[in-house]
Amino acid sequence: MAREPRKNAALDAQSAEDQTGLLTVKVEKEEASALTAEVRAPCSPARGPERSRQRFRGFRYPEAAGPREALSRLRELCGQWLQPEMHSKEQILELLVLEQFLTILPGNLQSWVREQHPESGEEVVVLLEYLERQLDEPAPQVPVGDQGQELLCCKMALLTQTQGSQSSQCQPMKALFKHESLGSQPLHDRVLQVPGLAQGGCCREDAMVASRLTPGSQGLLKMEDVALTLTPGWTQLDSSQVNLYRDEKQENHSSLVSLGGEIQTKSRDLPPVKKLPEKEHGKICHLREDIAQIPTHAEAGEQEGRLQRKQKNAIGSRRHYCHECGKSFAQSSGLTKHRRIHTGEKPYECEDCGKTFIGSSALVIHQRVHTGEKPYECEECGKVFSHSSNLIKHQRTHTGEKPYECDDCGKTFSQSCSLLEHHKIHTGEKPYQCNMCGKAFRRNSHLLRHQRIHGDKNVQNPEHGESWESQGRTESQWENTEAPVSYKCNECERSFTRNRSLIEHQKIHTGEKPYQCDTCGKGFTRTSYLVQHQRSHVGKKTLSQ
């Protein structure tokens, strides 16, 4: 009779122990599932274009009241996805190709690529090539030091992307994740073959790590467990120190998993984790692209050495100083050319007109006036120019760009000189003054036009202080400075001071419109009217895009 109570007590103890074991297994499974959800959570929300595509593809006929409403709803969802009012035909075609490209990828690989949110097929190719390079590299032997722990943690995080699915759809994925040294073994087998994990004296912790790599956990590995197992002297710590150290590691666990193991710093050096808003999750998911561009220690050292050499050369070579203004130059030729500003020396002389220049490049540009060379051609209208700056100014007539803005009234201009002239309206400045009557003007051209009233042939040029006659003007230019000459229209007897103005005026009577718009065919009497009209086409084209 005494044996039966003992037997019952033993059975009760064994039952309690079994229940405790089942509870432990259940807790570990819950931890694994929670960890899986934590890894997937930051990148799970679909972004704008992807969300619109999913709504379009996921629409079903029963959701609409009838066939007409279903068709209308499909058109609306397709428009929200492809956005034809914003995207060109090429961009819409690229979106369709991207969708099909992602569809033909194997299951696990497709999920990983979609989490990176590629915006074009080229980005998908770059991601796949990067993944192949990372997984085809031979795994280095892990040293015992801190650097080996760090490298192993990062490699383990890359391997967590492989899941233990046995479907036929995942066979190409398994071939892609082939590793040279560890082969295509399961993740927990690979971990147990890493030097440092299979050594004696760590059996308890090895069993703990291996227990978390069951098929139920889908190949996920807790980063802090690997870091703790590899820490030197881990087995010498007592249980209280182990728990304290594990709690400290647990604080940094979420940040390590969410970053996919791409952070290449020790987990114990990480700052406390701050909860990020949802809009920041997308940025975290794209860290892999940025990490791929981070140079290795050797490359970083080489780049730093090159930078230091450049800085030394720049500092050491800037020893040519101008004694007049203190400006320094890297080469003596630059200092020699600069000194001519102070001395007024102009050694380069034009053989055609005798004009002199400080530099040879200025002489080359000037000689194009005599040769008629105009090497810079506008691709839009074919007009040619002798200087690149003139071409840039001209191209703004096609694009409608006006980069120069007045701070006082907000009016914009395509050229800086036009802005300077406009500023004189606000300041009231009139720097050009007539020597005959004292009248002042904002522009030099207005002064010259005014001086024709006085009929003075030796009118002083305000820019050079020389008379027009002393500058060797031609007879045709003298006709513009002589005066006043009256050019009279035979049709309406209106008179003009310039013959060119009379010719432009006569087009009103003849109806001639020689300047035609290539876009719409409309004709104009003046080029300025045509240029102003062409800007309307540019504005419409910009709005349509």
Swiss-Prot record:
Keyword Hydrolase on entry: no
Gene3D superfamilies in the cross-refs: 6.10.140.140, Classic Zinc Finger, DNA breaking-rejoining enzymes
Keyword NADP annotated: no
Gene Ontology, cellular component aspect: nucleoplasm
Keyword annotations of the record: DNA-binding, Isopeptide bond, Metal-binding, Nucleus, Repeat, Transcription, Transcription regulation, Ubl conjugation, Zinc, Zinc-finger
One BP annotation, GO: regulation of transcription by RNA polymerase II
Free-text tissue specificity from the UniProt record: Expressed in adult heart, brain, placenta, lung and kidney, but not in adult liver and skeletal muscle. In 17-day old embryo, detected in liver, skeletal muscle, brain, heart and small intestine.
InterPro entries, per the entry: KRAB (IPR001909), KRAB_dom_sf (IPR036051), SCAN_dom (IPR003309), SCAN_sf (IPR038269), Znf_C2H2_sf (IPR036236), Znf_C2H2_type (IPR013087)
Record field: compositional bias (Basic and acidic residues): 455-467
Residue intervals of every C2H2-type zinc finger in the record: 320-342, 348-370, 376-398, 404-426, 432-454, 487-509, 515-537
CDD domains: KRAB_A-box, SCAN
Record domain SCAN box: where: 53-135
UniProt cross-link Glycyl lysine isopeptide (Lys-Gly) (interchain with G-Cter in SUMO2), position: 26, 29, 178, 222
Residue spans of biased composition, Polar residues class: 468-480
A molecular function GO annotation: zinc ion binding
Occurrences of domain KRAB (ranges): 221-317
Compartment annotation: Nucleus
Ranges for region Disordered: 1-22, 34-55, 455-480
The family this protein is said to belong to: Belongs to the krueppel C2H2-type zinc-finger protein family.
PANTHER family given in the database record: ZINC FINGER PROTEIN, ZINC FINGER PROTEIN 771
UniProt function note: May be involved in the transcriptional activation of MDM2 and EP300 genes.
Identification of the protein by name: Zinc finger protein with KRAB and SCAN domains 4
Native source species: Homo sapiens
Organism placement in taxonomy: Eukaryota, Metazoa, Chordata, Craniata, Vertebrata
